[in-house]
């Protein structure tokens, strides 16, 4: 349900009226600084801290493992953000740990830069980053007893995500 963090009263209404079984507010990136740079509209109209608060409130209503947040994995590697693959991986895993500890499940979609299509090393770096992130992230989900609920996203029906396939293995 939705990609935007909605006010608490609407979250509660969706639950009370049994309109949705799980909810997803797309934070997109981890870190307040990156959020402000990459998501200026979301930052201006909702704000990073309010986005996190909406996700936490949704966990209070829907329960642990029924609240998701889509994340764009690899956008941190764009030159303007000045991050190495190791730094980007560490940041993303820190975010995964933090969100999972709150009962929120991040869903990582691979960033696909249009400008990099003629730069094979860009795609190799992204592929390696994405593989490392997903392997380590599976360990984090396991640590918190979280699995992707099949009512939200199932094995073989994901777009550019690996979580369901890893969980199903």
Where are these regions (language model features)?
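Short beta-strand/loop segments at the ligand-binding rim of alpha/beta enzyme cores
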Residues: 1-4, 62-68
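Core AdoMet radical
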Residues: 1-10, 15-54, 107
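Active-site beta-loop-alpha junctions enriched in small/polar residues
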Residues: 2-6, 28-30, 72-76, 111-114, ...
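Short, flexible active-site loops
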Residues: 35-41, 67-81
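Auxiliary Fe-S-binding modules of radical SAM enzymes
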Residues: 53-57, 61-66, 79-169
């Amino acid at each position: 349900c939705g990609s935007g963090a909605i006010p608490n009263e609407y979250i509660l209404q969706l639950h009370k009226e049994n309109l949705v079984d799980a909810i997803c507010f797309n934070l997109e990136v981890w870190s307040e600084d990156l959020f402000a740079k990459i998501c200026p509209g979301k930052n201006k109209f909702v704000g990073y801290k309010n986005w996190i608060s909406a996700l936490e409130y949704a966990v209070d209503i829907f329960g642990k493992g029924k609240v998701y947040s889509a994340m764009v994995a690899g956008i941190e590697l764009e030159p303007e953000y000045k991050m190495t693959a190791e730094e980007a991986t560490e940041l993303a895993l820190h975010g995964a740990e933090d969100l999972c500890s709150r009962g929120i499940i991040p869903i990582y979609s691979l960033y696909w830069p249009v400008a990099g299509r003629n730069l094979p090393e860009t795609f190799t770096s992204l592929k390696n980053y994405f593989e490392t992130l997903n392997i380590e992230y599976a360990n984090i989900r396991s640590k918190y007893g979280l699995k992707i609920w099949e009512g939200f996203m199932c094995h073989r029906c994901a777009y550019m995500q690996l979580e369901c396939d890893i969980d199903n293995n």
